[in-house]
Design a protein with these regions (language model features):
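Conserved ABC transporter NBD signature motif
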Residues: 58-70, 399-407, 416
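Conserved ABC ATPase "signature" region
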Residues: 116-134, 449-467, 477
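ABC ATPase C-loop
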Residues: 155-156, 488
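H-loop/switch region of ABC-family ATPase nucleotide-binding domains
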Residues: 199-200, 530-531
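A short, surface-exposed alpha-helical micro-motif characterized by mixed small hydrophobic
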Residues: 205-207, 536-538
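Conserved ABC ATPase "signature" C-loop
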Residues: 218-219, 549
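ABC ATPase nucleotide-binding domains
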Residues: 228-282, 307-309, 313, 317-329, ...
Length: 594
């Protein structure tokens, strides 16, 4: 149903094509997964199917893309709307109405469908995606994950023959992601819908794919084949496949169920070893305040403090990175604390009401210097609201929030910027200037820092990016690194991140983990709201699970996630009842002779 014939795309001002030599056919009624590192042109390839490339994005498209016989070069996106449904990485960019029900109906109204057909399809979609309780809600009041489901629903209601989805589960909690993928699988199997999907969180989707298309590098010709065959050679692969390669399993498993069937031998090899205890992980037990911290002499492991968040650039040895970050952030020699440090933030019986909705109820939380806490829970559980309360964007209805002894909502933002910094779910929300240099100059002024402070951090976190680069021209990972540098300019003891791995591939996520571990080792307290269970397993000392605005679990990461079917990482599910969380832990044990 989709055919690419020697397709290449070159954007204005670039010296090489983003896509080149794409020559493949997507069969009708299959779910085809598009994979590859960040920046290889996955979104561009999807855009050629919907007609957004080149009609909306510009650039030159050579070759031919046809969808059910229609040439996308000669048919604009509106002329393909009855055939192709598209959801991009930013669902907010798609919304044209105010409420959930109106948004689901809008596409059908545009196509002139009968009112009784529209009503039936809206009801079906509300039930399919678990949106019935939200039908009258203003879209602006929904969480990011709820908005993602609405965006997917709005393209399902017209019943297109082809669905083009760019990161469709990136903002969804694990349970909601499974529900959406089950719906997509039902559309493929029962209705013959063709789904072309790009997704970085392969652990969620690869088991559902009929075929996988690998874009190995920018401008390189794609490779198409069976999921197991492609995962064996792909530079990006989910933990289940990584563990399978490490253990030498053949065929390569793509699901937890398949991996568990063959994991007996690996479990036996690991019986004599044990996962790192919490005391062996980076620990926040007795750090000094961030302003007094020195560079630790013995980081946890070389791999933990690996290179920057940007895709480009060689790894930096752990000691160098820790030392450079310490110098850039103005650290001085530590004074050994006699006991546990005072918490950076203390939340007591916090409740927040937004209109008729009680977003948080009696939440109590403390975070110590050097501690990393992952907030988890389903969409709408209150994670982003809690981060907003910590930074002062939301005032408590009852209870109290203290950051560095101050109430954030009642303190001048210019004073709070030195105590707490937030990297929002969309890093671009922090980026207003036309160049990286202008962003850095503004960050220095806002933080009262010496000129060049922010630029030095950008150079460390994002090497190779020129001063004149427009922030909107950066990749997702690069924008995240820039936003992180802007926030760190003020050297806040408390760092907050909302869904920091959205849009990042595994390599970029690994580099982000290295940077955040370095910051925690220097004494920064880190609180991150995430649906990424693999990130929590790699990074967090503690996991706090929220449900309907309440804390339902709070404890060491291993203890909380291993017992949870929804929030356990793939490695934990495969090797249970042993308490291994990550492939890197297993690799370390095997290399040590397990």
């Amino acid at each position: 149903v989709i055919r690419f014939e020697q397709v290449s795309v070159r954007y204005d001002g670039t010296d090489r094509p983003t896509l080149s030599g794409v020559d493949l056919a997507v069969p009708e009624g299959e779910l085809v997964l598009l994979v590859g590192p960040s920046g290889v042109g996955k979104s561009t390839l999807l855009g050629t199917v919907s007609g957004l490339v080149p009609h909306f994005t510009g650039g030159v498209l050579s070759g031919r893309v046809t969808v059910d016989g229609r040439d996308t070069r000669t048919h604009k996106p509106r002329e393909l709307a009855d055939l192709v449904g598209t959801v991009g990485q930013d669902p907010q960019a798609h919304f044209v109405t105010d409420t959930v029900e109106d948004e689901l109906a809008y596409g059908m109204e545009s196509l002139g469908l009968a009112p009784d057909v529209m009503r039936r399809r809206v009801e079906e979609t509300l039930d399919l995606l678990g949106l019935a309780e939200l039908r009258d809600r203003p879209i602006a009041t929904l969480s990011g994950g709820q908005q993602q489901r609405v965006a997917i629903g709005s393209v399902l209601t017209p019943h297109p023959k082809v669905l083009v989805l760019d990161e469709p589960t990136s903002a969804l909690d694990p349970a909601a992601a499974e529900e959406v993928l089950a719906v997509l699988q039902r559309l493929v199997h029962d209705l013959g819908t063709t789904v072309l999907m790009a997704e970085h969180r392969l652990e969620r989707v690869v088991q559902y794919a009929d075929q996988v298309v690998l874009l190995p590098a920018p401008g390189a010709a794609p490779v198409m084949g069976a999921p197991a065959d492609i995962m064996a050679v792909s530079p990006v692969r989910p933990p289940v496949a990584e563990l399978g390669l490490l253990a030498g399993w053949d065929p390569l498993p793509l699901s937890v169920r398949d991996a568990r069937r063959g994991a007996g031998g690996l479990r036996a090899r690991l019986e004599s070893a044990s996962p790192p205890a919490p005391s062996e992980l980076p620990t926040p037990s007795k750090p000094s305040a961030p302003s007094e911290l020195s560079t630790p002499s013995k980081p946890s492991a070389p791999s933990e403090l690996a290179a920057d968040v940007s895709v480009a650039g060689p790894p930096v040895p752990s000691g160098q990175r820790l030392g450079r970050l310490a110098r850039l952030l103005g650290r001085t020699k530590a004074v050994e604390a006699p006991g546990p440090a005072d918490p950076v933030t203390r939340v007591e019986s916090l409740s927040v009401r937004r209109g008729r909705i009680e977003a948080l109820r009696r939440v109590t939380l403390t975070v110590a210097p050097g501690e990393t806490v992952a907030l988890m829970g389903r969409n709408g559980a209150g994670k982003s609201t809690l981060l907003s309360a910590l930074v002062g964007m939301v005032e408590p209805t009852s209870g109290s929030v203290r950051v560095g002894g101050l109430a954030p909502a009642r303190t001048d933002p210019r004073a709070m910027i030195r105590r707490v910094g937030l990297v929002p779910q969309e890093p671009r929300d922090l980026l207003y200037a036309d160049t990286v240099a202008a962003e850095c100059a503004a960050a220095d002024r806002d933080a009262g820092a010496d000129e060049g402070t922010c630029r030095a951090l950008v150079t460390e976190l994002l090497p190779g990016v020129e001063d004149g680069t427009h922030p909107r021209d950066l990749s997702e990972g690069q924008r995240l690194a820039l936003a992180l540098a802007l926030v760190l300019t003020a050297r806040p003891p408390l760092l907050l991140l909302d869904e920091p791995t959205r849009g990042l591939d595994y390599a970029a996520k690994g580099r982000l983990v290295g940077v955040l571990r370095a910051l925690a080792a220097e004494g920064h307290a880190i609180v991150l709201a995430t649906h990424d269970v693999e990130l929590a397993a790699e990074l967090a000392h503690r996991v706090v699970i929220l449900a309907d605005g309440e804390v339902v679990a709070d404890g060491p990461t291993g203890r909380v996630v291993v017992s949870s079917p929804a929030f356990a990482p793939q490695t934990a599910k495969i090797l249970a009842p042993q308490e291994w969380l990550t492939v890197s832990q297993v690799r370390g044990a095997l290399e040590a002779g397990a």
